[in-house]
């Protein structure tokens, strides 16, 4: 696991996948610092938008792809446009998470 910031880690596999998606092909301390900050922002925003603050971007395919795309936008100075351009994907993730939460509540009420 790679520490992105204190208390937030991602797998080396996900970091490598993000680096590949944004065409980072070299080890540079400043670039890694910027990349990790972008990943941390992305995880925070995606969790917030999904209404699931413990959302696992490693195992949820939609969240994982949203994170990769968010980082791509963010590193290109376009993070403001991300939410608008990915609104259907964000809404789908949120609805799926809310439906799962309702299903869990109904199960525990039985």
Where on the chain are the PLM-derived regions?
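Conserved short "hinge" loops at termini or chain/domain junctions
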Residues: 1-63, 95-110
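General helical structural elements
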Residues: 45, 68, 76, 87, ...
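Mid-chain, well-packed structural core segment of small domains
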Residues: 55-79
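Intrinsically disordered, low-complexity regulatory regions of eukaryotic regulatory proteins
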Residues: 72, 87, 103-107
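C-terminal structural segments of small proteins and small subunits
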Residues: 75-95
């Amino acid at each position: 696991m790679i520490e992105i910031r204190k208390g937030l880690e991602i797998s080396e596999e996900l970091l490598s996948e993000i680096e590949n998606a944004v065409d980072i092909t070299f080890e540079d301390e400043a670039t890694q610092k910027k990349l990790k900050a972008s990943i941390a922002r992305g995880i925070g925003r995606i969790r917030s938008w999904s209404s699931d603050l413990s959302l696992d971007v490693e195992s949820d395919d939609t969240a994982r792809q949203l994170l990769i795309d968010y980082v791509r936008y963010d590193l290109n100075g376009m993070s403001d446009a991300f939410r608008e351009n990915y609104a259907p994907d964000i809404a789908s993730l949120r609805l799926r998470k809310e439906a799962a939460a309702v299903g869990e509540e109904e199960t525990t009420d039985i």
